Amino acid sequence: MENTLLWLVILIPGWALSDGSETELDFTWHLSRIPQVVSENTIHLASPTFQADAGVVKATVCGIECQEELPAPSLSQLEESLSYETIFENGTRTLTRVKVQGLVLEPTRNSSVKGAHPRRRRQVYGTDSRFSILDKRFATNFPFNTAVKLSTGCSGTLVSPNHVLTAAHCVHDGKDYVKGSKKLRVGVLKMRNKGGRKKRRGSKRSRREAESAGQSQAHLRESTTQRPGKKSRRGPRVTQGRPSFQWTRVKSTHIPKGWVRGENGGLALDYDYALLELKRAHKQQHMELGVSPTITKLPGGRIHFSGFDNDRDEQLVYRFCSVSEESNDLLYQYCDAEAGSTGSGIYLRLKEPGQKNWKRKIVAVYSGHQWVDVHGVQKDYNVAVRITPLKYAQICLWIHGNAANCAYG
């Protein structure tokens, strides 16, 4: 089962090319110049009450069909939605207004694009296709070790040595910050030794593993692939006991104003993302951000993500699935998932321009099982928020503090 999972992860892009219907050029990261989101001014706001329930979206949200009926937003509306709140660990809160530069506005919203299969509903479809990552050879290596757990019950993804990308509703319900988010923590999965103890912090082995994280994928293939008919001398190396988390406090949280609504405003699902800044840097390898391509540019039309589903007893759970429909800002997809996995970073594996290497990048955030408005009727779907060029520019600004490092994506 372990080797099967490894080959699934490695060979999925190859499956997409095997029928000859798609070319290698289709599966390359195409970097292009993106608009800039620039901070204009910052004002202080009153401290929140932290009384919202974690992970609960209390209203029907505007989904793909609903968005098709709306006019394209103006530049001022985009700047309003991309302005953002920052909440600090001491409870203080600020609002930063932004300006968008270098954007060419579209006259109308793009219509949705459907995938190859009819859309289905519910969180888990028929046979559960999720994989629990129990072996430390996988769980502690890239890309699985980029998945983290939030103390509010959601998941997230490491996108820099100091930052975690997650869903906005994991820390804010649209009106107030959730209970426990004032002392928000992020847990990085650590595996126990055979004796049930965690590795000693600061050990030489831990430092070597952190320093060699960039080579982990190649090492993983080499150390786990066996020749047919040859038994492993080491035997199965399945984790002993329960997983353990190394917890780090969150220093600050950024949320787009498009998610923060007043008493009369509805929730804008396309802004359901947030960035957490950690109080201290982690030693894990992180996953870079990328601009979400269209369905036709996805190898096999598939996406991937890992998170900590509540029904798997804090196990790290991986899945991949097809995208059924997309709009400018949202994806409807088939991935089996349960509560706890929301906030996970959805990633693709495409080739670097002009190279033979495949590279994974985060292109969307899993918003979860949501009730969406479909022509006036409420329906439930598994939804993800795409990282558009503007959102890439905004998240990049949050990470780097300026737009200088965010010109291409």
Swiss-Prot record:
Residues 124-404 form the Peptidase S1 domain. GO terms for molecular function: serine-type endopeptidase activity. Disulfide bonds join C154-C170. Residues 188-247 are annotated as: Disordered. Residues 1-20 form the signal peptide. Keywords: Disulfide bond, Glycoprotein, Secreted, Serine protease homolog, Signal. In ovary, it localizes to the theca cells of pre-antral follicles, the theca and granulosa cells of pre-ovulatory and ovulatory follicles, as well as to the developing corpus luteum. It is found in: Secreted. One of its GO terms (cellular component) is mitochondrion. SUPFAM superfamilies: Trypsin-like serine proteases (SSF50494). Residues 188-207 have a biased composition (Basic residues). Belongs to the peptidase S1 family. This is Inactive serine protease 35. It comes from Mus musculus. The lineage of its organism: Eukaryota, Metazoa, Chordata, Craniata, Vertebrata.
